[in-house]
UniProtKB/Swiss-Prot annotation:
Organism name: Anaeromyxobacter dehalogenans (strain 2CP-C)
Pathway(s) per entry: Purine metabolism; IMP biosynthesis via de novo pathway; N(2)-formyl-N(1)-(5-phospho-D-ribosyl)glycinamide from N(1)-(5-phospho-D-ribosyl)glycinamide (formate route): step 1/1
Subunit: Homodimer.
Keyword Metal-binding found: yes
Residues at which ATP binds: 104, 145, 150-155, 185-188, 193
Any one biological process term the GO annotation gives: 'de novo' IMP biosynthetic process
InterPro entries linked to this entry: ATP-grasp, ATP-grasp_carboxylate-amine, ATP_grasp_subdomain_1, PreATP-grasp_dom_sf, PurT, PurT/PurK_preATP-grasp, PurT_C, Rudment_hybrid_motif
E.C. number(s) listed in UniProt: 6.3.1.21
Domain ATP-grasp, chain residue ranges per copy: 109-300
Biological role: Involved in the de novo purine biosynthesis. Catalyzes the transfer of formate to 5-phospho-ribosyl-glycinamide (GAR), producing 5-phospho-ribosyl-N-formylglycinamide (FGAR). Formate is provided by PurU via hydrolysis of 10-formyl-tetrahydrofolate.
Name of the gene this protein is made from: purT
The keyword Magnesium is annotated on this UniProt entry: yes
Superkingdom of origin: Bacteria
Name by which UniProt lists this protein: Formate-dependent phosphoribosylglycinamide formyltransferase
Protein family (similarity comment): Belongs to the PurK/PurT family.
Length: 387
């Protein structure tokens, strides 16, 4: 079985998915808005177009005639995906999932209003005046996010009236596509944030990975660890909520479902219909198949063995500190750490805080995952990707 897969978005998550697909003999055409993106470096073919250009997407599909389209980013003209699906092309996990998750309004309203899941209180705004009114409605402190963005771009916490103008400007600078709108969320005093990787199958039950804990900074993940302790009743509720929202979206593939966790409560936060950045910890061998291999198997309809914890692990990001062409230093020191591994993504240009790689540390059964985080952070600190 050899499928031609059109990958829309070619970042580090797409690169690992492409490697997984290559290992099972699949053909990948990697698409991104710039040449030399990480997944393009390991794909059979590459294309450089704006995925918000519907005519350009139509031309790509006509040229390559893919069996499967796998979105890796949100900034896609999703109405075209619905048209391709109607023509018989498999869209992963489904065109409906891509359309609902390309902006936070659709997925939040689905979760909170249609499915009745517990979420933070929220309001929307598309002008500075409406934004000020939304903040007054929700109250301070609150969290502001563009309706369409990725990797934490444009997200901030507003704690005082004097922060409003800067928060609006920052959100507009971080938005993707042509949607100029924000969601204002109640600030929940959570104890931790978790990702529940959820695998849906065309034939077979929905599967769940052991919960992943993570820490955010500037709205973007900095470290993740697996497993994260969750009281059994709250884990059962997280699985119920993840199952409900993924069933509503349909299709087959992996979803990264995020939750806020407090002592005795859990809230649905966000969802990505693809491998999740915090799930890169699974590259440390924490489970029998990493998240990219799980995604591929679900996409192709291949058997998936029980997902169990093999060993605890942790990840820590390696960030750029300057601009220009990247030079990698410090690998020898980093890889001298027992149980450590490093993935350099191969992004061709630097900008401050851009994610250029990830440090991975695997432990032995029974090791404290949070102690592994400290080791992963130390490994990441030994690596520099600078001019």
């Amino acid at each position: 079985m050899r499928k031609k897969i059109l990958l829309l978005g070619s970042g580090e998550l797409g690169k690992e998915f492409t490697i997984a697909a290559q290992r099972l003999g699949q053909e990948i055409i990697a698409v991104d808005a710039y040449d030399g993106a990480p997944a393009q470096q390991v794909a059979h073919a590459r294309e450089v177009v704006s995925m918000l250009d519907g005519a350009a997407l139509d031309a790509l599909v006509a040229k390559h005639r893919p069996d499967v389209i796998v979105p890796e980013i949100e900034a896609i003209r999703t109405e075209r995906l619905q048209a391709y699906e109607a023509q018989g092309v498999q869209v992963v996990p489904s065109a409906r999932a891509a359309a609902f998750t390309m902006n936070r309004r659709a997925i939040r309203d689905l979760a909170a209003r249609e499915l009745g899941l517990a979420t933070a209180r929220y309001a929307y705004a598309s002008t500075p005046e409406a934004f000020r009114a939304a903040v007054h409605e929700i109250g301070l402190p609150c969290v502001v996010k563009p309706l369409m963005s990725s990797s934490g771009k444009g997200q901030s916490v507003v704690r005082a009236e004097g922060d409003l103008e800067a928060a609006w400007a920052y959100a507009m600078s971080g938005t993707r596509g042509d949607l100029r709108e924000v969601i204002v969320e109640e600030f929940i005093p959570f104890d931790s944030e978790i990702t529940l990787l959820t695998v849906t199958q065309r034939r077979g039950e929905t599967l769940f990975c052991p919960p992943i804990g993570h820490r955010q900074e500037r709205g973007d993940y900095q470290e993740s660890w697996q497993p994260h302790p969750v009281p059994p009743p709250l884990l059962e509720e997280a699985r119920r909520m993840a199952g409900a929202v993924t069933r509503a979206l349909g299709g087959a593939g992996i979803f990264g479902v995020e939750f806020f966790l407090a002592k005795d409560r859990i809230w649905f936060s966000e969802l990505s219909p693809r491998p999740h950045d915090t799930g890169m910890v699974t590259l440390a061998g924490t489970q029998p198949l990493n998240e990219f291999e799980l995604h591929l198997r679900a996409v192709l309809g291949l058997p998936i063995p029980p997902i169990t914890l093999v060993r605890p692990g942790a990840s820590a990001v390696i960030l750029a500190r300057g601009t220009g062409a990247p030079v990698v230093r410090g690998l020898e020191s980093a890889l001298a750490e027992p149980g450590a591994d490093v993935r350099i993504f191969g992004k061709p240009a630097l900008r401050p805080h851009r994610r250029m790689g990830v440090a991975l540390v695997s432990g032995a059964p029974g090791d404290d995952p949070r102690a592994l985080v400290e080791r992963a952070r130390a490994v990441a600190a030994r690596v520099s990707v600078d001019p």
